[in-house]
Structures are given as structure tokens and as C-alpha cells.
Regions:
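Flexible "arm" and connector segments at domain edges
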Residues: 1-57, 61-94
């Protein structure tokens, strides 16, 4: 995860994209990219172009991770906390 953080942070810094770093803009960008991902399934249940799906998924992940870094939060910890909460609400069935 640290390598990914470095890659994303450096990529954005080299393009001076930091001026756009607000929670609102990250949220909008995540939503827009998620909608673009969903378009691949709008008329069919299985997306035909896996590479395009991967590209849109990467966009969602990049914006999500960049938002975590902007907040000063560790994405792994955010995910672990959420899974603990979900596990309490939805116990295992096995």
C-alpha cells in the first residue's frame, strides 16, 4: 500500500492536481467514475470489455485512495474498521 500511495501522490503532484483536492471534488469524481463503470452493465449483465471495466475501476480506486491520503487516513484501517462494523451487523452463517 505504501508503494501505491507514493505512486499516486507523485503522479498527482507532478501534474499540480493538488489545487483540486477537496472532499467535495473527490466525492464527485468517485461518483462520476463509478457511473462510468456502471455504464458497462447498463444494457447487459456481463461487461464485454474487461480492459475498459478495469480502467474505470482503477479510476474509482485512485480517487478513493487519493481521498484517503488527503484526509490523512490509512485506507487499510478504514476498510478494516468498516468490515468490523459490517461483521457485527451481519454475523457469519457458518
Amino acid at each position: 500500500m505504501e508503494e501505491l500511495k507514493r505512486i499516486i501522490t507523485e503522479f498527482r503532484a507532478k501534474r499540480d492536481w493538488g489545487e483540486y483536492d477537496t472532499l467535495e471534488r473527490f466525492s464527485k469524481s468517485i461518483s462520476i467514475e463509478a457511473a462510468e463503470l456502471l455504464e458497462h452493465f447498463q444494457w447487459e449483465e456481463s461487461g464485454d470489455n474487461i480492459q475498459e471495466i478495469k480502467d474505470e475501476l482503477a479510476d474509482v480506486l485512485i480517487y478513493s485512495l487519493a481521498m484517503c491520503y488527503h484526509l490523512g487516513e490509512d485506507p487499510k484501517e478504514i476498510i478494516k474498521e468498516k468490515l468490523k462494523d459490517v461483521a457485527r451487523r451481519y454475523p457469519e452463517k457458518r
